[in-house]
Amino acid sequence: VAKCAMENGKHAAIEVPSAMNLEQCWNLIDLSEKTRLHCFILENCCYDDYEMKSLLMAQDGVFGEVIRAEGAYIHELSEFWKYYWKDPNDNDKDNLHWRMKYNMENRGDLYATHGLGPVAQCMDIHRGDRFTTLIAMDTESFAGKEWVKKNTGKESEEFRNGDHTTTLMRTAKGKVVEIQHNVMTPQPYNRLFKLTGTKGYATKYPTEEFAIAGDALTGTDAPKMDNINAHGFLNAEQKKALMEKYRHPILEKYAEKGRHLGHGGMDYVMDSRLVYCLQHGLPLDMDVYDMAEWCALGELGAISMDNNCAAVTFPDFTRGYWNEVKGYTHAYATPAQEAEQEAYADAYTAAQKEAVAKLKLWELYDAAKNAEGKTKTGATKKYEKAAARLDSQIEKILKVKK
């Protein structure tokens, strides 16, 4: 779908995991570069409140130099396996549904981006550093094989995905990232999100905590705190002060509107940022190279584990440009540009509503939808003819109101 979009002149935004193997990663990179169109990975966890505040702290030096990070997707899915899509073409004779079938047939971290995306941003991956080496190790499939046996009555001789997979990556600057994947064993939901720095430490699960060295806050924008050391976490008052200071401007702008929507508002913030950057012609928060880097763990991990957990060279998806930009940042328009764009968006929306009413598109759509037999073809053509005039009608209304 993403390839079709770019081949037809449209930017693409893909749900995770956006690419299932290295070939797909390179295909999307090649096409994005060829068409000069964006290919955005819809990684909503990069917009979580704790992750974004920790990113600001890391950028301000609160943790010193971040030298190690951990992320994960630990989410027991036993209640959900049978609700995933089932192939209607009878390619799933054991009724496993796509996700369990994919886990059974593939090794490696198959859902790495929730854990990897936020920590990769904190470690400036592709903005001054990159992954160079990967090693992966997994457990045997115990719970996976048992689920297949229980639900199909058959022994699963070959279940590729281990119940728990651990992937270690070393960067060009000598830092390390650990990513875990476990969708099989019973335990609380956990994305880990841990940052280890030369002056501090952040951890999100099971509770959001920070440990800061006594001199870590000197020279930063953090509020002054007395009697702190890294042997214990900040107390509730200190943590609150730190979190208040590093409220992310993106969340300040969008989070409240989306708080009651998908995943606590992360989806809304992510979609809003995508639209914002496209409207203003700004670099997206995550690009096609990030997408490839984060999605490559599946096949690279499988190669490592199929070769006795050997070290594997990580591809340079940027083709040598990973060190051109120094430090991860979000792009922003000026307040004047934002106001101008908001005014145009409001005017366009009003014009669109007016045009739809003038062309009677909803009435024609309902008529086509409800028509039967020979009348359906005529009703559909009538709707399509009117719909084809929508853009020109909108432009006409906008010109009149200028």
Region spans (language model):
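Beta-strand-loop-alpha-helix segment that lines the small-molecule cofactor/substrate pocket
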Residues: 1-47, 61
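Non-transmembrane alpha-helical segments in soluble domains
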Residues: 3, 29, 55, 116, ...
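Ligand-binding pocket scaffold of soluble enzyme catalytic domains
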Residues: 6-7, 29, 35-36, 70-73, ...
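Predominantly a Rossmann-like dinucleotide-binding segment in NAD(P)-dependent oxidoreductases
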Residues: 38, 45-159, 274
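Short glycine/serine/proline-enriched coil/turn segments at secondary-structure junctions
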Residues: 77-79, 185-188
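A short catalytic or substrate-binding loop motif that flags glycine-/basic-rich loops and adjacent residues
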Residues: 113-114, 158-163, 171-172, 186-187
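C-terminal helical cap and adjacent loop that interface with cofactors, partners, or active-site loops
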Residues: 120, 188-196, 203-206, 213-402
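Active-site beta-strand termini and strand-to-loop segments that position acidic
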Residues: 167-173, 195-197
